[in-house]
Curated annotation (Swiss-Prot):
Glycosylation sites: 93, 125
InterPro entries reported in the protein's UniProt record: C-type_lectin-like (IPR001304), C-type_lectin-like/link_sf (IPR016186), CTDL_fold (IPR016187), NKG2/CD94_NK_receptors (IPR050919), NKR-like_CTLD (IPR033992)
Single GO biological process annotation from the record: stimulatory C-type lectin receptor signaling pathway
The name this protein goes by in its record: Natural killer cells antigen CD94
Chief location bin: membrane
């Protein structure tokens, strides 16, 4: 009886060992495929983008852009300075994000990172301006302190607005206004 119990436990151990080996192999293959997929995904190039995707009821957006209220948005994860970000957006026929209303503010608040937006400090006017020269509405974004003005602004999903050096590197949001 003792011999048959030992044989049974050896058999069960062997089967469980094979199952564990198969699970580990499967996990390794899945992890390899995930890493390979992430490494070969194309990065957005500054060239023209012709492949379109449906954005909302009134617009089609370039691939990798997100449509909302007849505008297209690109949440770009490469770190660039404010000027580099602005220039990249311009090369895509867009501009750094200019938030126009609370609905748009809610839409861009879905991200967890800080992003450059199209706001800078004008020493000439002594105020914060959008990239297009319009004044920043006080009721839309949290008031930005101007004690030690660093000149450019990053925004996060917690409605945090920070002034930082324009030379710092950050993610950024480009916006194409289609209407």
């Amino acid at each position: 009886m003792a011999v048959s119990q030992t044989t049974l436990w050896n058999l069960i151990s062997g089967i469980l060992g094979v199952i564990c080996l198969l699970l580990m192999t499967t996990m390794g293959i899945l992890l390899k495929n995930l890493l390979l997929t992430e490494s070969i995904q194309p990065t957005l190039s500054p060239g023209p983008i012709t492949e379109l995707q449906k954005g909302s009821d009134c617009c089609s957006c370039p691939k990798r852009w997100i449509g909302h209220q007849c505008n297209c948005y690109l949440f770009f994860d490469e770190l660039k300075s404010w000027t580099e970000s602005r220039d990249f957006c311009a090369s895509q026929n867009s501009s750094l994000l200019h938030i126009q209303n609370r609905d748009e503010l809610r839409f861009v608040s879905s991200s967890k990172y800080f992003y450059w937006i199209g706001v800078y400090y004008s020493k000439e006017n002594g105020t914060w301006l959008w990239e297009n020269g319009l004044a920043l509405p006080q009721d839309l974004l949290q008031t930005i302190q101007t004690f030690d003005t660093k000149k450019c602004v990053i925004y996060s999903s917690s409605h945090s607005v920070l002034d930082v050096s324009c030379e710092d590197k950050s993610r950024f949001i480009c916006k194409q206004e289609l209407m």
